[in-house]
Amino acid sequence: IEYRLVPDCQVYDQFTDVADAMTHIFQSLSKFQGDSEQIYGVADSGGAYLLTYVTAMTGCRPLAKAAHTTPPSFRLRALGLISGMFYTTRFDKIGLVLPRYLYGKHYKKTPFAPFTNAENKDLVSSLPPCFLVSSHNDNLEHYTLHFEKALSENHIPHKLVLFPQNKRLTHAFSVFDPFMKESTEAIMAMHQFFETV
């Protein structure tokens, strides 16, 4: 799906774009003989962050309200999150630059502030089963590892596929080069996970 990009908008606009697209897909299922019980969401990098939050909003009304977003009226059965940019306010390259563009200058004083931490219990506990993919050469590998720990602590069914050091397996490699052997392995493992939830 397409969504507006920062700095032309804030993250709340992006959440709305994703939620609206999900709603449109759900409403269009009958045209394509889709099964409303078998809807999964897959995204990478910043899109994985947006998908995670909008999906959590379907089960966490305070999050949706704080984000000024009307969430989809249905739940995704599971998520596939590839090289997710889950953390936006840490003391790192992302956290030092993005927060004021994403959330606005005074976001720490808003109702959304507690949710800027992707490990927020209300947020994480509202997620469906998650399949995570990363690699040692992914610059956001540590984000995936920390988010996987949060899923474990909140008893969210999940699976992590972490590829070893390999200079070809960089950030979101399975999206940028889906025909690599490792990309096929990741995609097939995600498919198998989806079949079991």
Name each region found by the language model.
Residues 1-197:
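Alpha/beta-hydrolase superfamily serine-hydrolase fold, recognizing
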